[in-house]
Amino acid sequence: MSARKRVKRASAYDLYRTCKQAGTCPPDVIPKVEGDTIADKILKFGGLAIYLGGLGIGTWSTGRVAAGGSPRYTPLRTAGSTSSLASIGSRAVTAGTRPSIGAGIPLDTLETLGALRPGVYEDTVLPEAPAIVTPDAVPADSGLDALSIGTDSSTETLITLLEPEGPEDIAVLELQPLDRPTWQVSNAVHQSSAYHAPLQLQSSIAETSGLENIFVGGSGLGDTGGENIELTYFGSPRTSTPRSIASKSRGILNWFSKRYYTQVPTEDPEVFSSQTFANPLYEAEPAVLKGPSGRVGLSQVYKPDTLTTRSGTEVGPQLHVRYSLSTIHEDVEAIPYTVDENTQGLAFVPLHEEQAGFEEIELDDFSETHRLLPQNTSSTPVGSGVRRSLIPTQEFSATRPTGVVTYGSPDTYSASPVTDPDSTSPSLVIDDTTTTPIIIIDGHTVDLYSSNYTLHPSLLRKRKKRKHA
């Protein structure tokens, strides 16, 4: 079975006409038609306190009135709707009258005209009066002078020419151009394949406007009475790093907020050696001022070591320490600068003096004993069989001059070291039996009982890790 189609209920106004008298209206129909909903009540009572303009909200404007109810708002009619006096009946409607509200019978009133197209114009006149008002007396027509109009129905038209009255002489006025100054007009003609500006000649009689491109330019005539003032930018920085030092405003407006210090003269310039600032932003630039004594000096606000709390607050006065410089008396005799005749003069050495001849002495002499180049080259067989190969080896023959280093007394050692007879290096003999043995490694002496050497890490004793139980 198919579901029943839900039928839309009739509008509230259609239900109100049939169910009001029978008393079977739904609960939402009567308040909506009679304008007694919650929204209507809010507008009705709120309109007493506020002004809502000419909207008719809360002012009980005239509309369709139901029996026993209040007026409602009437919407505009559809486009093309008209209303006339005939739809009202034989009742006469005059300005300033309102239709009476009957009890129990709905009344039809004059509705508004269409919103899109106006209807028939309605005028408040009486039905008994004529629609067209004619004047009591009609003025006589004097007609046209010297003009006849034919009223014949034939195709021929009679035309009567008006003859001029007076002499037949006709005055001919010659138009002469006025004496005007000559104007200079510059014409800019653009010779283009797409557009050619037409060139017209200037005329002072007929049309003066043309299609020329007129450019007006030049300088002013006479003295303009002005002055050239350079443009100045206000508020813009003049340097890459603007220097704005915040100045203290304390004590300027309030006299009691000024801070006073006790000035203490000092003769120790070391007081100014250690300068510390809590906030360098408020420190002014160094200034040279003249004191009461007339001498220039150094001054600084100094806070001596006083009581200090646990929070770091220092309790105690601040002193203004001043160090005045010494005064140069006027009676001091100036010592003249004199040069003693016995003073030894200065010797001037010319920089561009010609160089004298000098002898070149070689610091090193190359001989056979210093040769480290290989003398003989031989080959050593490596491997066996097919893989046997010969590797060239070089035999070096080099000698190095060495000296004799002897420790202790020369009589202690019976054997003497072998030395090179051609060596010119001196022998070093240390005649001291208490000298600690020294080992020479690559020409550097190493003391066995001192700490001037470092062993290789492989020779150091390794530490064993302790095992924790």
UniProtKB/Swiss-Prot annotation:
Cysteines paired by S-S bonds: 19-25
InterPro entries on file: Late_L2
Annotated Low complexity bias: 414-429
Renumbered residue ranges of the record's region Disordered: 401-429
Residues spanned by motif Nuclear localization signal: 1-10, 461-468
GO molecular function annotation: DNA binding; SNARE binding; structural molecule activity
GO biological process, one term: microtubule-dependent intracellular transport of viral material towards nucleus
Subcellular location: Virion; Host nucleus; Host early endosome; Host Golgi apparatus
Keywords for this protein: Capsid protein, Cytoplasmic inwards viral transport, Disulfide bond, DNA-binding, Host endosome, Host Golgi apparatus, Host nucleus, Host-virus interaction, Late protein, Microtubular inwards viral transport, Phosphoprotein, Viral penetration into host nucleus, Virion, Virus entry into host cell
One GO CC term, this protein: viral capsid
Transmembrane segments: none
Protein's job: Minor protein of the capsid that localizes along the inner surface of the virion, within the central cavities beneath the L1 pentamers. Plays a role in capsid stabilization through interaction with the major capsid protein L1. Once the virion enters the host cell, L2 escorts the genomic DNA into the nucleus by promoting escape from the endosomal compartments and traffic through the host Golgi network.
Subunit comment: Interacts with major capsid protein L1. Interacts with E2; this interaction inhibits E2 transcriptional activity but not the DNA replication function E2. Interacts with host GADD45GIP1. Interacts with host HSPA8; this interaction is required for L2 nuclear translocation. Interacts with host importins KPNB2 and KPNB3. Forms a complex with importin alpha2-beta1 heterodimers via interaction with the importin alpha2 adapter. Interacts with host DYNLT1; this interaction is essential for virus intracellular transport during entry.
Similarity comment: family membership: Belongs to the papillomaviridae L2 protein family.
Name of this chain's protein: Minor capsid protein L2
